[in-house]
């Protein structure tokens, strides 16, 4: 893909205001990035906190970081998925080295859990 792709996104422009579905530009995938055609997306409590102002969020913000879909394109250096693969998105990347990751349970990544709880 060359140039930006037009896509729809749920955009928060101001806390306490409704999200607006807008057409936005999406750059092609960069190094270690994957372009996914979203089939389903969830809005979770952290999105609610951003929208209500309960957590500091740079605005405007695209909400709905939980999702699944099909890989459309991969950037340089991506070897774990190929176009056509069905994927579930993770908002916090797994380290790939801890006991949970090496035993096939990246959703329980010790590093990711620590980062989520402590921010470190």
Protein language model regions, located:
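Short structural boundary motif marking the start of a folded domain
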Residues: 3-10
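Extracellular beta-rich ligand/substrate-recognition surface
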Residues: 11-18
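Glycine-rich beta-strand-centered segment in the early N-terminal region that forms part
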Residues: 27-41, 51-102, 107
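Conserved Rossmann-like nucleotide-cofactor binding loop
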Residues: 44
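Short cysteine/histidine-rich metal-coordination sites, predominantly Zn2+-binding motifs
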Residues: 57-59, 112-120
């Amino acid at each position: 893909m060359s140039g930006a792709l037009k896509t729809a996104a749920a955009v928060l422009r101001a806390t306490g205001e409704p999200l607006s579905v807008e057409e936005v530009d999406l750059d092609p995938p960069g190094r270690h990035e994957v372009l996914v055609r979203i089939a389903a997306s969830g809005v979770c409590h952290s999105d609610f906190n951003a929208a209500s102002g309960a957590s500091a969020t740079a605005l405007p913000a695209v909400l709905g970081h939980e999702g699944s879909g099909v890989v459309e394109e991969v950037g340089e250096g991506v070897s774990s998925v190929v176009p056509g693969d069905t994927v579930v998105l993770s908002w916090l990347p797994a380290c790939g080295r801890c006991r949970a990751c090496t035993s096939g349970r990246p959703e329980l990544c010790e590093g990711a859990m620590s980062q989520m709880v402590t921010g470190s």
